[in-house]
From Swiss-Prot:
It comes from Neisseria meningitidis serogroup C (strain 053442). This is Threonine--tRNA ligase. It is an enzyme of class 6 (ligase). InterPro entries: aa-tRNA-synt_IIb, aa-tRNA-synth_II, aa-tRNA-synth_II/BPL/LPL, Anticodon-bd, Anticodon-bd_dom_sf, Beta-grasp_dom_sf, TGS, TGS-like. The gene is thrS. The keyword Aminoacyl-tRNA synthetase applies. Keywords: Aminoacyl-tRNA synthetase, ATP-binding, Cytoplasm, Ligase, Metal-binding, Nucleotide-binding, Protein biosynthesis, RNA-binding, tRNA-binding, Zinc. Its cofactor is Zn(2+). SUPFAM superfamilies: Class II aaRS ABD-related, Class II aaRS and biotin synthetases, TGS-like, ThrRS/AlaRS common domain. Catalyzes the attachment of threonine to tRNA(Thr) in a two-step reaction: L-threonine is first activated by ATP to form Thr-AMP and then transferred to the acceptor end of tRNA(Thr). Also edits incorrectly charged L-seryl-tRNA(Thr). GO terms for biological process: threonyl-tRNA aminoacylation. GO terms for molecular function: ATP binding; metal ion binding; threonine-tRNA ligase activity; tRNA binding. Homodimer. The lineage of its organism: Bacteria, Pseudomonadati, Pseudomonadota, Betaproteobacteria, Neisseriales. Residues 242-533 are annotated as: Catalytic.
């Protein structure tokens, strides 16, 4: 007899072997119908997989996150089924799950059109309506190869070649269509009703631009119709907030083919940039940082010594001059070590906090570039703290407090924390990594925050804490980082004189709050839908006259506002006031000021905030109100 322990601690006995589906059926008809898969001793399995020894078992349903991901994965297979029925010559490649969805890469003779995607979605719905069972058959390697050879699925054969150690493959049969996967998958297509294909894109085989271009069909799938509907609404809202669209509408920036991944900032966009940079500079000065500037281009030997050449050269731009090879810096850290090394440092100098709005370049694949979110040229709000091991926890705590306060100022109150651990390709010994990872765990504990851990996601030189902000649409963006590095100070010979007059290596904390300023501005645009808070808006007020009679008074109002530190623009065009209000509304300025004869006579201004008419206000009172609004945002949050 088999003893099966359920999540509530109860134990059920069965004849051996038994499947998850059979266990669910023995508990109740409702659970049997809802069972997508199972978790046996912590491992996900198909509902049809046999259990042959005493085990702990959890029935996975669409209410579980794992259940939703299995539904999405099975929807990817369903894309394959529909595509092969409609386009028999297409070659199926891979179809993984991604956040909130899935995709399938497909090799075709000619690119799919939006009409093709609509036809594929319609055929998927027809197949779901057939309510067929998805049948899993563990198939010997040689037989799996034969199946895909007969079907002409060359990419599946290449994938099998990548797995020389695998003796049997999970083959999932959707009627006549067969796909290969580790699984698990849904037992029946009835679980796949709440799906939608969302977009079409190109993708290179294995992500390498030297390889052939494939067609990538993206989709999403959910447990319920309401969840699908809510997701589609979020996507539609995200499209309205797209920073590329708003960047053009608000006249902030543009990009063009002659400078891929580089941004042309327009006056309003650069004003926004300057507000952010100057605010960060003020905060960093108050927190004890010293601002520095390091070279853009340095000799290749310097990058070899730092370890970047071995670990990062594919992402670096290189150039040569006078028979010397140079690289454009992809990050600022080695330059900051040079400043630390330029002079004899004492333990009394620590912690030393060096900050730089450092301009970096990384040779990102052209297909990966995306507006401001993924660029080749960018500026980081970078800083490096050189300290002793005893100072790690206090410096991490101070950084955490600074970061959380700044995020609140920008309107982000929901911050989650992840700890990224050692990657496979790394510098430094395991002992050094053990020490670094434990140091960050202790720092996070001291900050009183909860965190999740991400194995394999650290930088090559050290583990890192990642800070993720949640925006107005509920999306998570990784912005801030804190990385602990024992490796780079060793490689570049950083040292200080201890209290006992010995030499010691400092610990190096790499940290950023905004990350790339370009990307952070993209996130801000989408979070605020282009309607920035007063303190942040590139133009805070526009002042409009009704007739030429008020033009001089408008200039006086603008001068007084500008003298008080506000970014105000004049609109004295000879147009009707209704037109000017509508025209300026597209730029989403926080305030519009209208001046007529009455306001001019009474030394007042008629104020509009977005679509709301606030009436006529005394100018000095209005200025005081604006100042209080900024104080509330930056000091009182």
């Amino acid at each position: 007899m088999l003893n099966i322990t359920l999540p509530d601690g109860s134990v059920r006995q069965y004849e051996s072997p038994v499947t998850v589906a059979q266990i669910a059926a023995s508990i109740g008809a409702g659970l049997a119908k809802a069972a997508v898969a199972g978790k046996v001793n912590g491992k996900l399995v198909d509902a049809c997989d046999p259990i042959t020894e005493d085990s702990s078992v959890q029935i996975i349903t669409p209410k579980d996150q794992e259940g939703i991901e299995i539904i999405r994965h099975s929807c990817a297979h369903l894309v394959g089924h529909a595509v092969k029925q409609l386009y028999p010559n297409a070659k199926m490649v891979i179809g993984p799950v991604i956040e909130e969805g899935f995709y399938y890469d497909i090799a075709t003779e000619k690119p799919f059109t939006p009409e093709d995607v609509a036809a594929i979605e319609a055929r998927m719905k027809e197949l779901i309506a057939q309510d067929y069972d998805v049948v899993k058959i563990m198939t010997p390697r040689a037989e799996a190869i034969k199946i895909f050879q007969e079907r002409g699925e060359e990419y599946k054969l290449r994938l099998i070649d990548d797995m020389p150690e695998v003796e049997a493959m999970g083959m999932y049969h959707h009627q006549e269509y067969v796909d290969m996967c580790r699984g698990p998958h849904v037992p029946n297509t009835r679980f796949l009703k709440n799906f939608k294909l969302t977009k079409l894109a190109g993708a290179y085989w294995r992500g390498d631009s030297n390889n052939e271009m494939l067609q990538r069909i993206y989709g999403t799938a959910w447990a319920t119709k309401d969840e699908l509907k809510a997701y589609i609404q979020r996507i539609e809202e995200a499209e309205k907030r797209d920073h590329r669209k708003l960047g053009k509408q608000l006249d902030l920036f543009h990009l063009q083919d002659e400078a891929p991944g580089m941004v042309f900032w327009h006056p309003k966009g650069w004003a926004l940039w300057q507000v952010i940079e100057q605010h960060m500079r003020k905060e960093l000065n108050a927190a004890g940082y010293k601002e520095v500037k390091t070279p853009q281009i340095m000799d290749k030997t310097f990058w070899e010594k730092s370890g970047h050449w071995d670990n990062y050269k594919d992402n670096m731009f290189v150039t040569s001059s006078e028979k010397r090879e140079y690289a454009v810096k992809p990050m600022n850290c080695p330059g900051h070590v040079q400043i630390f090394n330029n002079g004899l440092r004492s333990y009394r100098d620590l912690p030393m906090r060096l900050a730089e709005f450092g301009s970096c370049h990384r040779n990102e694949p052209s297909g990966a570039l995306h507006g401001l979110m993924r660029v080749r040229g960018f500026v980081q709000d970078d800083a490096h703290i050189f300290c002793t091991e005893d100072q790690i926890v206090s410096e991490a705590r101070a950084f955490n407090e600074l970061l959380v306060r700044i995020y609140k100022q920008f309107g982000f109150h929901d911050v989650s924390v992840k700890l990224s651990l050692r990657p496979e390709k790394r510098a430094g010994s395991d002992d050094v990594w053990d020490k670094a990872e434990q140091g960050l765990r202790e720092a996070l504990t001291a900050c009183g925050v909860e965190w999740g851990e991400l194995p394999g996601e650290g930088a090559f030189y050290g583990p890192k804490i990642e800070y993720h902000v949640r925006d107005a649409l509920g999306r998570s963006w990784q912005c801030g980082t804190l990385q602990l590095d024992f490796v780079l100070p060793e490689r570049l010979g950083a040292e200080y004189v201890t209290e006992n007059n010995d030499r010691a290596r400092p610990v190096m904390l790499h940290r950023a709050i905004l990350g790339s300023l370009e990307r952070f501005i993209g996130i801000l645009i989408e979070n605020h839908a282009g309607s920035f808070p007063l303190w942040l808006a590139p133009v805070q007020l526009v002042i409009m006259n009704i007739t030429e009679n008020q033009a001089d008074y408008c200039r006086e109002v603008a001068a007084k506002l500008q003298a008080a530190g506000f970014r105000a623009e004049l609109d004295l065009r000879n147009e009707k006031i209704g037109y000017k209000i509508r025209d300026n509304s597209q730029y989403r300025f926080p305030y519009q000021i209208v001046v007529g004869d009455k306001e001019k006579q009474e030394n007042k201004v008629a104020v509009r905030r977005k679509a709301e008419d606030l009436g006529s206000l005394d100018l000095d009172d209005f200025i005081a109100q604006l100042q209080q609004e900024i104080t509330d945002a930056l000091v009182n949050h």
